[in-house]
Amino acid sequence: GQLTYSFTDGSGRSGSIDRTRLTQNVTCSTNGARPTNADFALSGNWYDPSTSGQGLTVDVNPGSGTVFAAWYTYAPTGVGAGVAGQRWYTAQPTSFTPGARSIPLTIYETTGGVFDQPAVPGARTVAVGTATLAFQSCSAATWSFTFTGGSSSGSSGTIALKRVGPLPRGCV
């Protein structure tokens, strides 16, 4: 598929980006009132209502043993809006046991990239910390993190998360 975008900020920027599904043949089915595999139901958008504008997008695929999280947040120094203040991190586990409700992950920071451009010389992705994503239910989770490097080095904490939007069918 393809993502087409157009900014309305007067810059005239628009374009399209080819998309490729990272995990093929994802299927979900239900059996009675509960999903046959609750792991898929944990995928979605999560946030802390007290920190609007920040959160996680999580994709859990037990069929391929894959978990991916994108964390959008701000610099720990309280830098204002814009490039200097925004932070995007990704997180992946070294291994994942389907059915696990607590998932240890490595946090990665990518720097040097350019929007809607192929990989550029100097762009790099490095491990900058660790996190644990623990699901209490289909609607509540915690994100505990520690940064050991990168632009947020020394920061740590735990964030109580709520699901954005309705619960998947069969989730409680």
Q: What is the meaning of each model-derived region?
A:
Residues Q2-V172:
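Mature soluble binding/inhibitory domains
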